From Swiss-Prot:
Keywords: Cytoplasm, Isomerase, Porphyrin biosynthesis, Pyridoxal phosphate. InterPro entries: 4pyrrol_synth_GluAld_NH2Trfase, Aminotrans_3, Aminotrans_3_PPA_site, PyrdxlP-dep_Trfase, PyrdxlP-dep_Trfase_major, PyrdxlP-dep_Trfase_small. Signal peptide: none annotated. This is Glutamate-1-semialdehyde 2,1-aminomutase. Its cofactor is pyridoxal 5'-phosphate. Pathway: Porphyrin-containing compound metabolism; protoporphyrin-IX biosynthesis; 5-aminolevulinate from L-glutamyl-tRNA(Glu): step 2/2. It holds the Pfam family Aminotran_3. The lineage of its organism: Bacteria, Pseudomonadati, Pseudomonadota, Gammaproteobacteria, Thiotrichales. It catalyses: (S)-4-amino-5-oxopentanoate = 5-aminolevulinate. It comes from the Bacteria. GO terms for cellular component: cytoplasm. GO terms for biological process: protoporphyrinogen IX biosynthetic process.
Length: 433
C-alpha cells in the first residue's frame, strides 16, 4: 500500500495533543516496529477503511467485540431506536434488566450480574468483592495474563514464581501490589506452593481460562479444574476473567467448554456489541455483598447506559441463534487449517490455534510447546513483526503484537479467508530460511 500519507499526518498531529498519539498503547504499532498506526475512517462487515481509503480485512474486531462484524444492521437499528429516547439517564432502565437476564440465562455460573463501563472496572470490582467476601487481602494472578490497568494487576513476576509482586509501571506504589502474588500459567505446583506459604491469606485466584493476552495459550492437564480444587481446599474464590473469551469461544464462555465453575466471572467486549460495557457476576450469595444490597461499594455514572445495553441485547440475541457458533468456528477452522497447511508445505516454523471465534498465531514449529508466558517469549517475535508488516501492506489487519490473540467474525467470507491464506503462503515462500 503506497498511500499512507493521511494516517502519517494525523499521527503527527495526535502526538501534539495525546500522549504517544493514541489512547491505548498497543494501537501505536510500536511493538511491531511501525512508525505510525493506520487511522480508521469507517468499518463495515469484515472490513476497515483508513483515512487514505485503504481497505483491510480485519482480524482484530475492535479487540474482540465485533463478533457480528462491524456495523451490523440489527445492532445499529437497536442503537438508533434507543437514541430517540435519550443518551443516558443516570437512573435504572428496562434494558439493564433485559441484558442481565440474558447473561444469567447464557452463562452457566452467573446468578447475578453488575454492569460497569470496561473490563478493567469489572476485574478491579471483582477483586474488591473477593477480598471483602473472604476477609483476606492477597490475590494470585498469572504471568502474562492481563486483567486491565488497575494498580494491583500491573505486576510482573520476580525471579521466581513465589516472588511477591513488583510494579511494572511507574506510579504504582509497591505497597499497593505487595498483596499480588504471581504464578506461572499452567503450573499448578507454583499455585500450591503459594498457598502453602500464604495459607489463610489468599482471597482469590484470577485467571484468563484461555490466556488471550499472551497470544492464545490453552490450559493444560486439567489446570482449571486443579485451580478450582485448590481454591475449595483453602476457602478462596476462583475468578474467571472472560472479558475476552465470554461469548467469543462459546455461547457460555470458556467455563462451559472446560466445565469448571468459577465463583465470579468478569465480562466485556462482546456483551456491549461494540459499545463500552463491562460486567462482573457470579453466585448470588457473593453478589449480594455488592452495594446497595451489601457493604462492598461499586458505582459508575454511565454504568448500565441504555444505548450500550441495547447494543448488547441485540448482539447476544444474534449469537444465541442455534447455528451461530457452528458457523463462526467453521470460519476460524478454515483460516487456521489453511495457515497450518501453508506452513507445512513451505516447512515454515509457524503454527496456529483456534477455538470458537478466536485464534492465535505462533512463529515456531508446532512441536514446540507454548504453554507459558516464558515459552511465548522464545518464539520468533521478529518474524511475526515482519509478517504483520507484510500483511498490513497487503490489506490484512492483524493484531499489532505477537502477544495478542486474533478474532474472526461471522461477517468474514470464504474469499476473505482464502486471501489471507494466499498472502501467508507468499510470505512463507519469500521468507524460507
Amino acid at each position: 500500500m503506497e498511500n499512507k500519507i493521511n494516517s502519517q499526518s494525523l499521527f503527527q498531529e495526535a502526538l501534539q495533543y495525546i500522549p504517544g498519539g493514541v489512547n491505548s498503547p498497543v494501537r501505536a504499532f510500536k511493538s511491531v516496529g511501525q512508525e505510525f498506526p493506520r487511522f480508521i475512517k469507517s468499518a463495515k462487515g469484515a472490513y476497515l477503511y483508513d483515512v487514505d481509503w485503504n481497505k483491510y480485512i480485519d482480524y482484530i474486531g475492535s479487540w474482540g467485540p465485533m463478533i457480528l462484524g462491524h456495523g451490523d444492521d440489527d445492532v445499529l437499528e437497536a442503537i438508533q431506536c434507543q437514541l430517540k429516547n435519550g443518551l443516558s439517564y443516570g437512573a435504572p432502565c428496562k434494558q439493564e434488566i433485559e441484558l442481565a437476564k440474558k447473561i444469567v440465562e447464557l452463562m452457566p455460573n452467573i446468578e447475578q450480574v453488575r454492569f460497569v463501563n470496561s473490563g478493567t472496572e469489572a476485574t478491579m470490582s471483582a477483586i474488591r468483592l473477593a477480598r471483602a467476601y473472604t476477609g483476606r487481602n492477597k490475590i494470585i494472578k498469572f504471568e502474562g495474563c492481563y486483567h486491565g490497568h488497575a494498580d494491583e494487576f500491573l505486576v510482573a513476576a520476580g525471579s521466581g514464581a513465589l516472588s511477591l509482586g513488583q510494579p511494572n509501571s511507574p506510579g504504582v506504589p509497591e505497597d499497593v501490589v505487595k498483596d499480588t502474588l504471581v504464578a506461572s500459567f499452567n503450573d499448578i505446583e507454583s499455585i500450591q506452593a503459594l498457598f502453602e506459604k500464604y495459607k489463610n491469606e489468599i482471597a482469590c485466584i484470577i485467571v484468563e481460562p484461555i490466556a488471550g493476552n499472551m497470544n492464545m495459550i490453552f490450559p493444560q492437564d486439567d489446570f482449571l479444574a486443579k485451580l478450582r480444587a485448590v481454591c475449595d481446599e483453602n476457602n478462596s474464590l476462583l475468578i474467571f476473567d472472560e472479558v475476552m473469551t465470554g461469548f467469543r469461544v462459546a455461547l457460555g464462555g470458556a467455563q462451559s467448554i472446560y466445565d469448571v465453575k468459577p465463583d465470579l466471572t468478569t465480562l466485556g467486549k462482546v456483551i456491549g456489541g461494540g459499545m463500552p460495557v463491562g460486567a462482573f457476576g457470579g453466585r448470588k450469595e457473593i453478589m449480594q455483598e455488592v452495594s446497595p444490597a451489601g457493604p462492598v461499594y461499586q458505582a459508575g455514572t454511565l454504568s448500565g447506559n441504555p444505548i450500550a445495553m441495547a447494543a448488547g441485547i441485540k448482539t447476544l440475541e444474534k449469537v444465541s441463534q442455534d447455528d451461530f457458533f457452528v458457523k463462526l468456528e467453521a470460519k476460524a477452522k478454515q483460516l487456521v487449517d489453511g495457515l497450518n497447511e501453508a506452513a507445512r508445505v513451505y516447512d515454515f516454523n509457524f503454527h496456529a490455534k483456534y477455538l470458537g471465534g478466536m485464534f492465535g498465531l505462533f512463529f515456531c514449529n508446532e512441536k514446540v510447546a507454548v504453554n507459558t508466558f516464558t515459552d511465548l517469549g522464545k518464539t520468533n517475535l521478529k518474524m511475526f513483526n515482519k509478517y504483520f508488516a507484510y500483511m498490513l501492506d497487503n490489506g490484512v489487519y492483524l493484531a499489532p503484537s505477537a502477544y495478542e490473540a486474533g478474532f474472526i467474525s461471522i461477517a468474514h467470507s470464504d474469499e476473505d479467508i482464502e486471501k489471507t491464506i494466499c498472502l501467508t503462503k507468499k510470505f512463507f515462500q519469500d521468507n524460507q530460511s
